[in-house]
Amino acid sequence: MKIACLLGQGFEDSEFRVPYDRLLEEGYQVDVIGVKAGEELTGYKGKEKAKTEKAIDGVRADDYDALLIPGGQSPDHLRADKRVIDFVRAFDASGKLVAAVCHGPQLLAAAHLVKGRTLTAWSTVQDDLKQMGANVVDEEVVRDRNWITSRKPDDLLAFSSAIIDSLEGSDEAPAPRKGDNTAAHP
């Protein structure tokens, strides 16, 4: 299975790295997609670097099984590009998994997809989503049809597990893996 990861400058370091690594560990192919191919990206904390493997104008939603949208400043930069918004819309229309964390739902909002949907996001993004007609809940992981959303880095283990469970066709709540830090989970 192939996963598209939309990434721009200033991504939240762990919100890219944790789900990206978990997906690779599970045997998924993850393509980092940006505005341009070969662009060197740096997380806003400066701890992580990533290189875009493909340009947005060279990919189609049909090429992938799921979409990952990390947070940080990346979604704010990406939402200014109509090609990115069109890709997000096409992905949602396909009914395939869309997973967004923290500021990631800004791309869903920019694509005018949040009205009537239930989701979560970083606290400062939640009001914007509500104003656009979304039902926002403050929970670690929220599933609504083909969407999985999460709030913040503390939620990443549950977020990553929910993505993998969805890709594997499981609707059950994920059990913590051996060695997972579950202190952030109630």
Feature roles, as predicted:
Residues 1-94, 98, 107-118, 126-186:
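Extended, subdomain-level signal for the structured scaffold at the beginning of enzyme domains
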Residues 102:
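Catalytic nucleophile serine of serine hydrolases
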